């Protein structure tokens, strides 16, 4: 049997990854797209505070016509003034509960045709499932998941009917707790994991209408809601969550808006989030053949890293549990 020439091996080594890149460039779907923001209508739910308000500021500063929806009329008025003061842009405000489909539909109809829809509302309480009342669980899922269905369903007919307006976008703000379950977040994680299935199925349904879905995964973010939640979250939840650090709302909003404009299906906001997205990409669509290449070649090592994270978390839970039983 003839020996394999070292020169042939040197030739073969780059051919394999280049061939894989060529294949991925042919098969990645949906195809790359750019979503313009300037002079377009951005409608943001949960827009009166936190990430939603930061996104509204950014959209307005980039020349969008901005509408924000939230429950509190007084907070909406404060948000409107802060955006106008910072950007000079007049913002439309709508007071409605996302659990009320009729109220949401009325607000969206009044706001006019939407080009960039950002579904951002969210509620969370960190405590063990056994300590949640059925009403707590229902409220979390109704706002975070059912509310997202309500907003998208209300906006979709007019978005699909758009003619000659360029590519549109529907973005859902999830959480890193929507990629991996975290102690104390059983109800919250369930509500955010549901957005993954919604986004994947929705992208298939609206791609022929030139509508592009983005799923955003922020880490802990320094919002008023997060500050309140930290006061009551279990100690072990804080230990696990610390592995991904925290970010400011403006940082998250920039990452999110950049991802929306790039038409990315998945948007991670920090390095730990990027690793988490690689670990949990599964059947998610991917527009970039370079990122698809990275997902393929790092699948094994990333799984090993994920197992080390799980080991560390379970050790923390074990240690914390022992202190509670003493």
UniProtKB/Swiss-Prot annotation:
GO terms classed as biological process: 3-keto-sphinganine metabolic process; sphingolipid biosynthetic process
Protein's pathway: Lipid metabolism; sphingolipid metabolism
Pfam family, one: adh_short
Origin species: Arabidopsis thaliana (Mouse-ear cress)
Name of the protein described by the UniProt record: 3-dehydrosphinganine reductase TSC10A
Catalytic site: 174, 188, 192
Binding site for NADP(+): 188, 192
Nucleotide-binding listed as a keyword: yes
Entry's transmembrane regions: 8-28, 265-285, 289-309
Motif (GXSXG): 46-50
Tissue specificity note: Expressed in roots, leaves, stems, flowers and siliques.
Domain of life: Eukaryota
UniProt keyword Transmembrane helix present: yes
Enzyme Commission code: 1.1.1.102
Disulphide bonds in the chain: none
Positions on the Lumenal side per record topology: 1-7, 286-288
Recorded family membership: Belongs to the short-chain dehydrogenases/reductases (SDR) family.
Catalytic reaction list: sphinganine + NADP(+) = 3-oxosphinganine + NADPH + H(+)
Gene deletion effect: High frequency of tricotyledons and altered flower morphology. The double mutants tsc10a and tsc10b are not viable.
Species lineage: Eukaryota, Viridiplantae, Streptophyta, Embryophyta, Tracheophyta
Gene Ontology MF terms: 3-dehydrosphinganine reductase activity; NADPH binding
């Amino acid at each position: 049997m003839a020996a394999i020439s070292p020169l042939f091996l040197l030739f073969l080594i780059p051919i394999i990854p280049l061939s894989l890149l060529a294949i991925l460039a042919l098969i990645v779907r949906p195809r790359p797209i750019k979503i313009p923001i300037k002079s377009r209508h951005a409608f943001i739910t949960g827009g009166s505070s936190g990430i939603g308000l930061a996104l509204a500021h950014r959209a307005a500063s980039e020349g969008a016509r901005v509408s924000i929806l939230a429950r509190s009329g007084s907070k909406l008025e404060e948000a409107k003034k802060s955006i106008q003061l910072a950007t000079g842009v007049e913002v439309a405000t709508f007071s409605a509960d996302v659990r009320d489909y009729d109220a949401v539909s009325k607000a969206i109809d009044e706001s006019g045709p939407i080009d960039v829809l950002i579904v951002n509302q969210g509620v969370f309480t960190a405590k063990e499932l056994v300590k949640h009342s059925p009403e707590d669980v229902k409220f979390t899922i109704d706002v975070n998941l059912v509310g997202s269905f309500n907003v998208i369903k209300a906006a979709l007919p007019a978005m699909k009917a758009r003619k000659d307006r360029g590519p549109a976008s529907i973005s859902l703000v999830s959480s890193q707790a929507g990629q991996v379950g975290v102690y104390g977040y059983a109800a919250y994680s369930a509500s955010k994991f549901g957005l993954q299935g919604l986004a994947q199925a929705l992208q298939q349904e609206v791609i022929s209408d030139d509508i592009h879905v983005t799923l955003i995964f922020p880490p802990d973010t320094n919002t008023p809601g997060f500050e309140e939640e930290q006061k009551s979250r279990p100690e072990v939840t804080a230990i696990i969550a610390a592995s991904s650090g925290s970010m400011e709302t403006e940082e998250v909003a920039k990452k999110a808006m950049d991802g929306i404009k790039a038409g990315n299906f998945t948007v991670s906001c920090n390095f730990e989030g990027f690793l988490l997205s690689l670990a949990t990409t599964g059947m998610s669509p991917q527009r970039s053949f370079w990122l698809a290449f990275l997902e393929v070649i790092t699948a094994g090592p990333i799984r090993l890293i994920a197992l080390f994270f799980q080991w560390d978390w379970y050790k923390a839970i074990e240690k914390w549990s022992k202190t509670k039983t003493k």
